[in-house]
Structure formats: structure tokens, C-alpha cells
Amino acid sequence: MAIGRDAATTRRAFLRAAALVGGTLAVARTTDAAGATAGATGPALLGRARRTSVLKTIVVSCQENHSFDHFVGSDARLPAGYGIPRGWQNSGVRPFHFSNRTGDGVDPNHDWVSTHRAVAGGTMRGFVANGNGRDAMGYYTAADLPYYYSLLPHATLCAEYFCGVLTETLPNRMVLYAGTSGGITDDVAPANGSLTWPCITHLLHDAGVTYANYNVHAPANYSYLCLWKGNHNDPRLNRTTARFFADCRAGTLPNVVWIERPSPFDEHPPASIRIGEALSAQLFAAIQGGPQWARGEVAILHTYDEGGGYFDHRPPRAIDAFGSGVRVPMLVLSPHARHGHVDTTYSDHGSVLKLIEHVFGLPTLASVNHAFDRSTPRSAGQGRGAAFPPRDGSAKISDLTQCFSVAV
């Protein structure tokens, strides 16, 4: 789920400001001429040469709460073992086609405890018994998601891509931006500007790589990036819907772009999936109609933050005590993507960071963040646990470069 960061715009009433506990790394901050704050990760970037890539802009589009099997597992083009298995069932309930596009109006359980019960030690047989009942086994088809399915012949579909943590939204968004949730396993959000360990914007700023977050139909400070020190009220992270379309037309999208959308545009159940899909079609068409796409400079990474309590049959690997999480869709769109390809290389949300770091010649967050326990204890509390190292330092997940037909 997506959550506005300011108290006045928080969508989930149960979210409250809470201080992040344990394992923090102070990040020095300065203020630039525009009033935006800038991070300093120390000498790690000094003397690093910017590499040259055919990609100049990476757009990260992350929606809400849909697992892979539930969303695209019915596609007949998937290789054996990656789509919904014939005869698969949970507690006697087999996957079934939803008769509507609101998932029967249900938002299945998907917190830390619920997701671990659903994964059931890697058997993936606990989605129904977890308390979600029959609705956890519903899926969609190409008829329900015509735009997304129309992209498949023109994109790489990552069929072995997992979210970051076996839990709900906040920790997974944190992995997407920082490689680690800092030990957080629930949706109780820290206060804006309170996180002091590095996230990807710090690396980008220090390397002179441009970036922006666009709040599409969303209020200011809506992005989880605003949780980090110096990012709250940063104009780079608070660009508007109108600015997005203007930048697409002008060919001025920065090097790294994030797109944030509120409900019902984020596809979070039980909102109609067609609403979010329609907005994605508009946003992607604007990018693809711009001069940067025409020059072959752009890649769009479209994924989902977590599985939302919906079934999937492929077990995640134990990268550390927190994840990976449940398998989710990931589409890689680019003039240089391997069109019509289904990639089966193991990846998770940390892979997005690895691609950004690779393309722009950045160090990993794992290499500059020395605060978190490298041993990663094999237990974690429901709300907080021992902080785990940034996932972009793991050799167990890909950097997504295999999704492109040329070296990037």
C-alpha cells in the first residue's frame, strides 16, 4: 500500500510516526542553492569515474499488492514451472479466475506474521489457511489487464522476481530505496526526515546523477523517500503530475525517476485494477512518446511492492532473515529490452538498486553502510528486528542487466 508521509495526508489511519530504533548511520547533509538537501556518503564516491551507458534514464514504477501468479501467472507464454501449476491448491482451494476486477472487494492479510504463514516454510501452501480464505487464490487474465498483457511482446517479463521482505508495504519500499528496511517489518512509519542511514538518493546526489520523484495525483511528500534525512520537502522528490508530462514532452526527465500514485491509482486491493492500469498506460505513453525514448535512452521498471496476500507457488530464497519476499511482477520496458523475453534469473527489489548503481557507476549502498549487522540473526520481531545489510551487496540477486539486448 502507498501511504502519504505528512500527518494531514496519511491514508492509513493506523500509521503513526515512530522513531527508527537501532543500527543507524549518520549521513551528513548540506543544502543546495534551490533549498534541496544533499547527502554525503563520505569519500566513497571521490575519484569514481562515471561509466557510459546507452541508458540515460531509469524510471521506477512501483504499484501495490499483487503477486506474480495472481497477476500474470495465467499467461500461456510462461515457461514450465513459472505460471500457475496445473492442479495447484491451498487447503483444497484451487486458483480461480476473479469474476470482477476488484478482487471480490477483499484486501487479504499480508503483514509479517500472515505472509510467513502463507509461505509456510517455502511450501507456499498457507495462503488460504492464513485466514484469507478462497479470495487469496483468485487470479486475473489478459482480458482483465489488456494493457499490461499487451506490453509483454515488447518487454522482458521477470518471472523470478521477488519483493524484498516477507511482509507488507513499508519495509518493501525501504528495500527498494535503500536495500534494507533497517529491521522494520511492519507498516508503522518513522517520521519524515528521520532515517539517517543511506538511501539511493544520497549516492545519486554525491555522484552528480540527477533524479526526481513525481507525485502523480498525490500530495507533497507522498514518497517513502521522504522518510530519509534531507529528503523531506526536497523539491526534486515532489514534482507534480503536470511537471511529469511536461518533462516527458521536453525530453528533460532526469537520470533516475520514481513515480508515486495514491489509491485508487496504485491498484491496491480492493480498488479496481483497471483504474491503475489506465493511468500506467497514460504515463508510459508519455515517456514512450518523448525524445528520450526515441533516442533509446530510457528503461521503465514496472513492479509491485509486495504480494498483497495473494497466492504464488514459487518459494523465495533466504537471502537473509527477512527475505526475499513473495514473487511479484516485474516488467522491463525499453528500446533495448529483450522484447518478448521471459527472464528466470533470481532477482528482488535490491536488483533495482543494483541496476541503477551499475548504469551510473555508483558504489553499492552495502559498501557505504557499515552500521547493520553483517551476521543477520535468523530471527526478527513482528514490528522490529535486527537490521539487515543492504540487499544490493548480495551476489544472490541479479542486477537486471540480463533483461537487455545490449550491454547497459
Give the residues covered by each predicted segment.
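N-terminal pro-sequences and low-complexity stem/linker regions of secreted or lumenal proteins
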Residues: 2-8, 13-408
